[in-house]
């Protein structure tokens, strides 16, 4: 396997950004928080913006896009985003017309030695997507967060991946017993909301049986989950797999 790095720079409701590097080429998936926070986290992870060839956006929500404007102003890097998500950001996102590569949920592009392919995901946003990244040697990585449930399309794209970044957003008891208003609890728990620990854990044995070796649990809720709770439940569900829980405020390396 070629020189490979996969880590979340930060992950959670305050901001999301994932760094994937294969050899001398890297991509970012999402760019939440601020450009300063992003570059500081990237430096802490041992990465560099000099290697970043493109940014891939999952959807338009602020915790995934708030650093895009400053990033677009400072770096000559294409921003791959679905037509629906871009429409939601415009006209305020004046940087998009000169940087955006608009695409449908079914899209594939070559970036260095990586083939990045998008697939549709169920979330309360406009045309949200996940991504697979296939390396030159055939190794596949996959990314799926902000998903209300595991659809057949998600399963089809994640099956066979060597490593997967997968949402494990909330513990159902913590969510329902917590302080959130009823409408917000309903939104989070819906089929177009966020994936629970239990739903994530139920899928892990299927991934392992199909060859997945590494999973990074991502987009954990600070209010309705804890890294230890998510990790303990996931490891109990699939003890054979290497599983790591992303930390909200610091880089978490899977590979």
Label for each model-derived stretch:
Residues 83-139:
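Metallo-beta-lactamase
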Residues 29-32, 52-60, 80-83, 142-145, ...:
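Active-site neighborhood of phospho(di)ester-bond hydrolases with catalytic His/Asp-centered motifs
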Residues 152-248:
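Cap/insert and terminal regions of metallo-dependent hydrolase folds
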Residues 7-17, 58-68, 90, 118:
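Structured catalytic core of nucleotide-sugar glycosyltransferases
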Residues 1-45, 129-145, 163:
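Conserved beta-strand hairpin/beta-sheet module of binuclear metal-dependent hydrolase folds
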Residues 14, 61-65, 86-89, 125-126, ...:
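Active-site environment of divalent metal-dependent phosphoester hydrolases
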